[in-house]
A protein has these predicted regions:
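Acidic, metal-coordinating helix/loop segments flanking the phosphotransfer/catalytic sites
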Residues: 30-49
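Residue-level signal for the "D+5" position in two-component response regulator receiver
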Residues: 30, 56-59
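Active-site residues of response regulator receiver
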Residues: 53, 81
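The short loop immediately C-terminal to the conserved phospho-acceptor aspartate in CheY-like receiver
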Residues: 10, 54-55
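Short acidic/polar segment at the start of the alpha1 helix of CheY-like receiver
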Residues: 10-14, 113
Length: 139
């Protein structure tokens, strides 16, 4: 069973995403702060996917993802935001280029449960493919 770490400071969003993923038989680890996500990433065994809100109170989803990927280079990341991806890439392009293109995706709020599940499945499947290039590629 794939294990998914979710980071969102909004309790309703965190619970909603967790419930949907659990209904699809994923093992879910929840975190409401960046430090909690990093600790869970270290202590909860192998993580198949990291799902994170981009805009967090004391850090960014990008910063937390980079810390997790530093210790697990094959970890795929799904970024979630109500702000368009173009804004984030213009603001933080150098950091996005540090993620392998085939192991990162972005979904903009509001999104459907189907959209979320398709992106989760695709990212987990991509981890089985060999690493080919670096850089951010929006799907």
């Amino acid at each position: 069973m794939e294990s998914i770490l979710i980071l969102d400071d909004d309790a309703a969003n965190l619970q909603g995403i967790a419930d949907v993923l659990r209904s699809e038989h994923y093992s879910v680890i929840e975190a409401s702060t960046g430090s909690q996500a990093i600790e869970n990433g270290k202590s909860c065994g192998p993580i198949s996917l990291f799902v994170t809100d981009m805009d967090l109170p004391r850090s960014s989803g990008t910063d937390i993802a980079l810390k997790l990927v530093a210790s697990n280079p094959n970890l795929p990341v799904l970024f979630i935001s109500g702000t368009p991806m173009a804004w984030w890439t213009n603001r933080d392009l150098s950091n996005f280029k540090r993620f392998p293109a085939n192991r990162v995706d972005f979904i903009e709020k509001p999104f459907s449960l189907t959209q979320l599940l398709v992106r989760v499945r695709n990212l987990i499947q991509r981890t089985l493919q060999p690493r080919t290039e670096s850089g951010f590629q929006a799907a």
